[in-house]
């Protein structure tokens, strides 16, 4: 497919999803054009047969068209322009669509809730990847060249410069999340950012670091700004809901002056009294659960084995708050490399299919076109073009990923837990320099590389033995 998404392809997709009048929203994640639809019965599932489309995921209120990294963003931008040129609907059409949209909301609340995470975190992912890569490369250079932490000179200065982006991102990350979350839940982004900033401020006048808020209690009640990302998400949701209620009763002439003011006062009160303690408990519980799963080899195997299924259903973005919680509690994201084993298992399965296929078959061409992205951590071309349509190889790919997750879990159980140095990043081989551990970057890279190798080999063996029987290898 050409680098640019053709207008003919987008017009065809628009027609097959029911036309502009059936589109409720248009957005994208890293690899998918996400179209919210009013009536899923109008969607033609044969969109997946269009040239340039790598796959399609259908839910009761959303169509996810898989294009691949970079292309999804361009497709969403071009589709938004097409929708902006669409003719205006009449009142009857709008009423009918609102009715269908309400029905969809009533029947797909869980998926809609998980889809919010894509809206909140997808715009941040390029920054996570860039900051994580810079930090990983700087750490690797410092380790290999034995640069002390307090060294002076051009090289240490350059390494510190490369690391500063990660420090800046994670110091003020909650403000970015608060802004995006408030918008995703229907509120004003800056209100969410201001509320999120309350979680960053310090409430101990004797502290020598941080930014003192100017008071240490809330009308005599202690302040415990815990919970971080979990608390910020809850607070941003509450902020958006409160803003909507205030706006309903606010006269138009006073809206700009008073709506945000009242919203902030009410939300901040709830944050200090309820949300911060609640977010802290949820944060501790979530961290405890996944830290114990990560140190349990069987738990790691289950997580890695099921992750491809989460990708197929489009709910894998729901793990991002967990990644952020683990960053806060451990200092690295120990879950991400475990889940990355799913993609490695699929690479092994694809190589087995290539080996078993006929020399000039279409299957070999499909694998050749998708294997390099798979090695680099982009799994959708392999999922939708190679393994999932044949089902058995998809299952054996999941088993290969589970084996890789088991390997990483065993190493952690034996005393070497490791993880990603960022909340989110690339997977596959590209993620190697982003690995870190308490023992340093090189042991972490070795464990991750070992997990990938185990997943490749097991995915290949499982598919060769069980994934090719009664499967179309043409």
UniProtKB/Swiss-Prot annotation:
> According to the lineage, what is the superkingdom?
Bacteria
Statement: the UniProt record of this protein carries the keyword Transmembrane helix: yes
TM helices/strands, residue ranges: 124-144, 158-178, 181-201, 218-238, 261-281, 302-322, 335-355, 369-389, 394-414, 441-461
The record places the active site at 29 (phosphocysteine intermediate)
Q: Which residues lie on this side of the membrane: Cytoplasmic?
A: 1-123, 179-180, 239-260, 323-334, 390-393, 462-474
**CDD domains per UniProt:** PTS_IIB_glc
A single GO BP term for this record reads: phosphoenolpyruvate-dependent sugar phosphotransferase system
GO CC entries: plasma membrane
User: Known catalysed reaction(s)?
Assistant: N-acetyl-beta-D-muramate(out) + N(pros)-phospho-L-histidyl-[protein] = N-acetyl-beta-D-muramate 6-phosphate(in) + L-histidyl-[protein]
The protein's UniProt keywords, in alphabetical order, are: Cell inner membrane, Cell membrane, Kinase, Membrane, Phosphotransferase system, Sugar transport, Transferase, Transmembrane, Transmembrane helix, Transport
Residues on the membrane's Periplasmic side span 145-157, 202-217, 282-301, 356-368, 415-440
Q: What is its EC number?
A: 2.7.1.192
Any one Gene Ontology MF annotation carried by this entry is: kinase activity
The chain positions of domain PTS EIIC type-1 read: 115-474
Transmembrane as a keyword of this entry, yes or no, is yes
Specify the PTS EIIB type-1 domain's residue ranges.
1-89
| Localisation per UniProt entry | Cell inner membrane
Quote the record's domain comment: The EIIB domain is phosphorylated by phospho-EIIA on a cysteinyl or histidyl residue, depending on the transported sugar. Then, it transfers the phosphoryl group to the sugar substrate concomitantly with the sugar uptake processed by the EIIC domain.
Q: What does this protein do?
A: The phosphoenolpyruvate-dependent sugar phosphotransferase system (sugar PTS), a major carbohydrate active transport system, catalyzes the phosphorylation of incoming sugar substrates concomitantly with their translocation across the cell membrane. This system is involved in N-acetylmuramic acid (MurNAc) transport, yielding cytoplasmic MurNAc-6-P. Is also able to take up anhydro-N-acetylmuramic acid (anhMurNAc), but cannot phosphorylate the carbon 6, probably because of the 1,6-anhydro ring.
Q: What is this protein called?
A: PTS system N-acetylmuramic acid-specific EIIBC component
Q: Which organism is it from?
A: Escherichia coli O157:H7
């Amino acid at each position: 497919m050409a680098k640019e998404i053709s207008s003919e392809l987008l017009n065809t997709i628009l027609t097959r999803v029911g036309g502009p009048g059936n589109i409720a929203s248009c957005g994208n994640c890293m690899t998918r054009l996400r179209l919210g639809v009013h009536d899923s019965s109008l969607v033609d599932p044969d969109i997946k047969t269009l040239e340039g489309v790598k796959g399609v995921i259908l839910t009761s209120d959303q169509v996810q068209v898989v294009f691949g990294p970079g292309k999804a963003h361009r497709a969403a931008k071009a589709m938004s322009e097409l929708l902006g040129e669409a003719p205006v609907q009449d009142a009857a059409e709008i009423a009918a669509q609102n009715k269908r949209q309400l029905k969809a909301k009533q029947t797909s609340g869980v998926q809609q809730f998980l889809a919010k995470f894509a809206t909140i975190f997808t715009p941040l992912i390029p920054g996570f990847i860039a900051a994580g890569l810079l930090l990983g490369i700087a750490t690797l250079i410092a380790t290999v060249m034995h640069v002390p932490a307090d060294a002076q000179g051009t090289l240490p200065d350059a390494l510190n410069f490369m690391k500063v982006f990660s420090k800046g991102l994670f110091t003020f990350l909650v403000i970015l999340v608060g802004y995006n979350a408030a918008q995703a839940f229907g509120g004003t982004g800056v209100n969410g950012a201001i509320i999120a900033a309350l979680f960053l401020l310090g409430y101990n006048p004797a502290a020598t670091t941080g930014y003192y808020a100017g008071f240490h209690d809330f009308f005599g009640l202690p302040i415990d700004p815990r919970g971080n990302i979990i608390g910020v998400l809850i607070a941003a949701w509450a902020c958006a809901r409160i803003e909507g209620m205030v706006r309903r009763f606010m006269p138009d002439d006073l809206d700009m002056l008073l709506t945000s003011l009242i919203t902030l006062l009410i939300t901040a009160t709830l944050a200090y009294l309820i949300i911060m303690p609640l977010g802290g408990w949820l944060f501790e519980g979530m961290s405890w659960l996944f830290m114990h799963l990560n140190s349990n080899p069987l738990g790691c195997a289950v997580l890695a084995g099921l992750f491809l299924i989460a990708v197929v259903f489009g709910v894998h973005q729901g793990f991002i708050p967990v990644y952020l919680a683990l960053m806060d509690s451990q200092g690295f994201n120990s879950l991400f490399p475990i889940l990355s084993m799913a993609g490695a298992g699929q690479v092994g399965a694809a190589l087995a299919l290539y080996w078993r296929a006929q020399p000039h078959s279409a299957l070999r061409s499909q694998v050749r076109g998708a294997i390099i992205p798979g090695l680099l951590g982009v799994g959708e071309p392999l999922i939708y073009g190679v393994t999932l349509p044949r089902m058995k190889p998809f299952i054996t790919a999941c088993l290969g990923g589970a084996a890789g997750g088991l390997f990483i879990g065993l190493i952690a159980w034996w005393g070497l837990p490791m993880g990603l140095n960022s909340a989110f990043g690339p997977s596959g081989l590209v993620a190697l320099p982003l690995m870190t551990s308490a023992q340093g970057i090189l042991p972490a890279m070795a464990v991750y590389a070992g997990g990938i190798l185990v997943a490749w080999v097991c995915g290949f063996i499982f598919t060769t033995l069980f994934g090719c029987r009664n499967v179309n290898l043409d």
